[in-house]
């Protein structure tokens, strides 16, 4: 058996009884008491780990109140909808701080859609989404206005995450993308406008059939998830939830195009 080390002084600890199904430990050096859960995502939670994981997964598709009903009917546990919301919020912050290196292709698609955020000057705020041609989400950014500043912020964020500019950027007819692409990526990145109709372009020695239907299809999936919120209370909260769904889409959610997925057990 591998000995347990103290998280505070790194000395070998001794067993000190049990709490429910968890082994407790006590450090011989600093007398710190802790358990197997002390440094995990589930520290100081009284519900079992599977209940918390399932509630978080349910919340990716339905509201917290429906998640509460599903847990009660399937697993006979009755956490409050507020507890489920707090678990999901903690998971969102955990994903935001998770550093994972991903590789993206050289063809990117960008689009924006309106969402409701309390406090926005217009009737709506705007969610900017950048993906590559393999359906991997690179970034999701929420801004209060649909202008060049929002486009620059989204593309700058995507460039920082991917650590390289794309060769081709495809967008709809919004003129802000043209200036934002030149400002963020420079002249080496080719920008093309292609909405629902396919645009045929010869670049170098290759013929490209360019369309933005790929990201329009993703927007329909975002709508199904966003519908359960009915809007966000703050801009920071909107960015946090949208980034959480982006990580969920990239890492966990199965897609038509084959890609490597991981279980939520590998994250928390």
Indicate where each model-derived feature is located.
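A short, conserved beta-strand element enriched in hydrophobic/aromatic residues
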Residues: 70, 125-147, 154
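Active-site beta-loop-alpha junctions of metal-dependent nucleic acid enzymes
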Residues: 46-47, 90, 140-164
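Short, cysteine/histidine-rich loop/knuckle motifs that typically chelate Zn2+
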Residues: 7-8, 29, 221
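Short, positively charged, Gly/Tyr-enriched micro-motifs
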Residues: 26-106, 112-121
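Residues immediately within or flanking Cys/His clusters that coordinate Zn2+
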Residues: 3, 24
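Short amphipathic alpha-helical "interface-anchor" segments enriched in bulky aromatics
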Residues: 63, 207-246
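Short Cys/His-rich "knuckle" micro-motifs
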Residues: 14-19, 37-40
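C-terminal domain-tail junction helix/linker
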Residues: 228, 232, 239-268
């Amino acid at each position: 058996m591998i000995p347990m080390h103290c998280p505070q002084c790194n000395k070998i600890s001794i067993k000190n009884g049990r709490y429910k199904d968890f082994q407790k430990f006590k450090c011989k050096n600093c007398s710190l008491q802790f358990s197997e859960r002390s440094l995990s995502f589930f520290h100081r939670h009284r519900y079992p780990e599977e209940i918390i994981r399932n509630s978080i997964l349910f919340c990716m598709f339905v509201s917290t109140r429906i998640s509460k009903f599903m847990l009660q009917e399937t697993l006979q546990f009755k956490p409050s909808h507020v507890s489920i919301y707090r678990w999901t919020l903690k998971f969102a912050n955990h994903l935001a701080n998770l550093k994972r290196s991903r590789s993206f292709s050289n063809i990117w698609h960008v689009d924006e859609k309106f969402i409701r955020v309390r406090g926005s000057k217009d009737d709506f705020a705007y969610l900017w989404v950048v993906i590559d041609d393999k359906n991997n989400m690179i970034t999701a950014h929420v801004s209060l206005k649909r202008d060049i500043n929002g486009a620059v912020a989204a593309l700058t964020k995507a460039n920082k995450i991917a650590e390289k500019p794309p060769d081709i950027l495809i967008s709809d007819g919004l003129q802000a993308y043209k200036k934002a692409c030149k400002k963020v990526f420079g002249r080496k990145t080719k920008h093309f406008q292609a909405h629902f109709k396919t645009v045929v372009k010869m670049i170098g020695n290759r013929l490209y059939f360019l369309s933005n239907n790929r990201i329009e299809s993703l927007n329909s999936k975002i709508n199904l998830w966003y519908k359960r919120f009915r809007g966000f209370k703050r801009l920071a909260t909107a960015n946090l939830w949208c980034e959480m769904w982006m990580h969920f889409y990239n890492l966990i959610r199965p897609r038509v195009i084959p890609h490597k997925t991981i279980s939520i057990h590998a994250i928390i």
